[in-house]
């Protein structure tokens, strides 16, 4: 059903070329592979060529929706280029339509990320001001020719933004009464049924009959990876393919239940799914009720059994081919998605080619499969056993740090309240010693992006503070050295938990004192938390008081560009190894460091074991590094300063380099 016309030719050609080996021949082989796969998956290099190539299947009763290949715009120049490409395509498709209308004639699919280089929730106002007019102009052009325009689905973090654009488009007075607006919804998203409820309500409120293309989803791998990398609470998509199959059928039933406001377009290559929809929709089919869709180069053999008269043994249901248009150079990203999708061992396209899988297993009812799984596992809807939640990514030894989903409106509202609440915090940094410290006049710390904003005040350490701190560290060293590594690890883990709980105020402080964007600030806090947990594991697993002897007082000098992450990483590493720490933060960012130290002390680090000495490198830093009682220096910064420190320290190393 899903055989390709050039599988054998592709395999033999590549085998011959690779067999000759040599880099030039390998390059030629890859180039040939791209061209052969381009012929398989791309309808034409230009819209004119694609329209001509589509005529063969149109004669059999197939319809087409053309997609101009290309990924997200990275620059305004890219966006303008894609906009012009879409405009040209609509003119060409519209002329080729010959007035057949949105259901019988060809249409176009557009990718919103191609129309704006900053298509993200963080740039909401810009998207509405700059991207929406482009979307509207394309939709009006499609209306002029009466061809359908579908807004393609993309990553989950852009879903709500795309829905806002869709709603605004539906209430556009110039589009009143036109039913050619289309939207794509992904069944693998856990929100899919609720998105369908929303678009049904939107269609009723705006008095449009919306075209809704239901797909299973093409970004599964990246959605899983993004959730893990960003430390999200869970996954936006199902972790088991069979759940997506059931979701698809359930959502198809929803779409078919409201024919007055929704024109369903079912995009699937799964014969069982197709059959289920065919039976759910009933035998009383009428033109314009619904249609099936498939990808060019993949689904035509299956749908040749569907499109055509009943008298010819067909099902007499329409199918629209999703037809990519573009050069081989623009094919790669689309091709990778297709290969990932169909290379998965749960893919119907993959499984049908596997002769070891029986026809009964291939067309098994997904509901029955889930019931069987539930019997074996003791419950319904359990996640994939080999895909842990983002927090459990590193196993039982340590938790992954939690992030904040910056596309989640509830999280953004909570963050906004927290930032407002802490905006007037009286942030302070001063020497934090295990003994008495000096009392100097504090100086204001200004927001680098707004010098009118006084973030807080810093009192810099004096030479006497440095000398006293080193002596305090020496006094505290035996206590910390004798502390069992497991206890040191537990303290670092408590510090990580405290820091994670303070992510919102820390974000505000990082933004105001260090000039961080919120996305960078989240990453900074998470990295600091990860450092604390990582070194806790190292202490617990790799250190014993019998086998490892700490160095003694260690100076940690950190930079301004990572004032929390690198600062915390240096401190955590030294503490995990049993050393007392003298922390000298960058002079530009003492407030962040002071708050980090407060959290670590609150977690249970004894007085004198961790001390903060804010101040300038040429005074505080030089005094610390030059003292013979200091046994180790951890430094992150410029090469120039590193060489100065190296020269300073090298003169007092013993025969063992200590």
Identify the meaning behind each predicted range.
Residues 1-400:
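Positively charged, amphipathic and often flexible ligand-engagement surfaces
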Residues 37-48, 58-64, 74, 137, ...:
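Catalytic cores of nucleotide-enabled group-transfer and carboxylate-activating enzymes in metabolic
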Residues 67-69, 111-113, 150-154, 184-186, ...:
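Generic beta-strand/beta-sheet core signal
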Residues 92-95, 140-141, 168-171, 254-257, ...:
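Conserved helix-loop functional segments at active or binding sites
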Residues 139, 252, 571-572, 621:
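Generic hydrophobic/aromatic pocket-lining and core-packing "Φ" positions
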Residues 313-315, 326, 330-333, 337-471, ...:
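Terminal low-complexity tails and localization/encapsulation signals of metabolic enzymes
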Residues 541-607:
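Conserved small-residue-rich beta-alpha loop and adjacent elements
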Residues 542-544, 548-557, 602-658:
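Conserved NAD(P)+-binding/catalytic subdomain of aldehyde/semialdehyde dehydrogenases
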């Amino acid at each position: 059903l899903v055989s390709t016309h050039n599988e054998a030719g592709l395999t033999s050609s590549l085998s011959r070329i690779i067999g000759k080996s040599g880099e030039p021949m390998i390059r030629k082989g890859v180039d040939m592979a791209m061209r052969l796969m381009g012929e398989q998956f791309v309808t034409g290099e230009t819209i004119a060529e694609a329209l001509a190539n589509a005529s063969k299947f149109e004669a059999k009763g197939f319809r087409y929706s053309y997609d101009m290949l290309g990924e997200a715009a990275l620059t305004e120049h890219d966006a303008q280029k894609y906009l012009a490409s879409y405009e040209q395509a609509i003119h060409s498709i519209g002329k080729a339509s010959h007035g057949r209308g949105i259901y019988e004639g060809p249409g176009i699919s557009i990718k919103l990320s191609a129309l704006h280089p900053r298509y993200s929730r963080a740039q909401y106002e810009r998207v509405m001001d700059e991207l929406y007019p482009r979307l509207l102009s394309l939709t009006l052009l499609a209306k002029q020719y009466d061809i359908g325009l579908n807004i393609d689905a993309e990553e989950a973090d852009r879903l709500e933004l795309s829905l806002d654009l869709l709603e605004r488009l539906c209430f556009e007075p110039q589009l009143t009464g036109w039913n050619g607006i289309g939207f794509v919804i992904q069944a693998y998203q856990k929100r899919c049924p609720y998105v369908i409820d929303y678009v049904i309500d939107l269609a009723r409120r705006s008095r449009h009959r919306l075209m809704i293309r239901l797909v299973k989803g093409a970004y599964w791998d990246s959605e899983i990876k993004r959730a893990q990398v960003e430390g999200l609470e869970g996954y936006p998509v199902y972790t088991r393919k069979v759940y997506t199959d059931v979701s698809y059928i359930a959502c198809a039933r929803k779409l078919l239940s409201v024919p007055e406001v929704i024109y369903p377009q079912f995009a699937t290559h799964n014969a069982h799914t197709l059959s289920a929809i065919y039976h759910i929709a009933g035998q009383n089919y009428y033109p314009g009720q619904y249609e099936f869709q498939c990808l060019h180069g993949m689904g035509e053999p299956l749908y040749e059994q569907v499109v055509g008269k009943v008298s010819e043994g067909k099902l007499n249901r329409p199918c629209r081919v999703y037809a990519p248009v573009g050069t081989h150079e623009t094919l790669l990203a689309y091709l990778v998605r297709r290969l990932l999708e169909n290379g998965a061992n749960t893919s119907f396209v993959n499984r049908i080619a596997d002769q070891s899988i029986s026809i009964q297993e291939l067309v098994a009812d997904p509901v029955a499969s889930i019931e069987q799984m539930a019997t074996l596992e003791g419950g319904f809807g359990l996640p994939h056993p080999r895909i842990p939640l983002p927090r459990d990514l590193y196993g039982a030894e340590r938790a992954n740090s939690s992030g904040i989903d910056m596309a989640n409106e509830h999280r953004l509202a909570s963050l906004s309240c927290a930032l407002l609440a802490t905006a007037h915090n009286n942030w302070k940094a001063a020497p934090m010693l295990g003994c008495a410290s000096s009392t100097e006049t504090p100086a204001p710390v200004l927001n680098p992006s707004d010098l009118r904003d006084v973030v807080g005040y810093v009192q810099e350490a004096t030479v006497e503070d440095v000398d006293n701190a080193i002596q305090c560290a020496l006094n505290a060293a035996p206590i910390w050295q004798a502390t069992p590594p497991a206890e040191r690890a537990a303290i670092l883990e408590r510090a990580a938990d405290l820091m994670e709980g303070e992510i919102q105020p820390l974000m505000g402080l990082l933004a105001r004192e260090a000039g961080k964007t919120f996305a960078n600030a989240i990453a900074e806090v998470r990295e600091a938390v990860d450092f604390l947990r990582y070194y806790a594991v190292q202490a617990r697993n790799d250190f014993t008081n019998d086998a490892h002897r700490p160095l003694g007082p260690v100076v940690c000098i950190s930079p301004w560009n990572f004032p929390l992450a690198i600062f915390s990483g240096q401190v955590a590493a030294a503490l995990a190894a049993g050393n007392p720490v003298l922390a000298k933060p960058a002079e530009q960012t003492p407030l962040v460091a002071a708050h980090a130290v407060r959290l670590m002390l609150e977690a249970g680090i004894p007085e004198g074991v961790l001390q903060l000495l804010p101040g300038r490198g040429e005074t505080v830093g030089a005094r610390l590094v030059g003292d013979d009682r200091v046994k180790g220096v951890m430094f992150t910064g410029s090469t120039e300063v590193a060489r100065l420190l190296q020269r300073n320290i090298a003169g007092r190393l013993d025969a063992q380099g200590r």
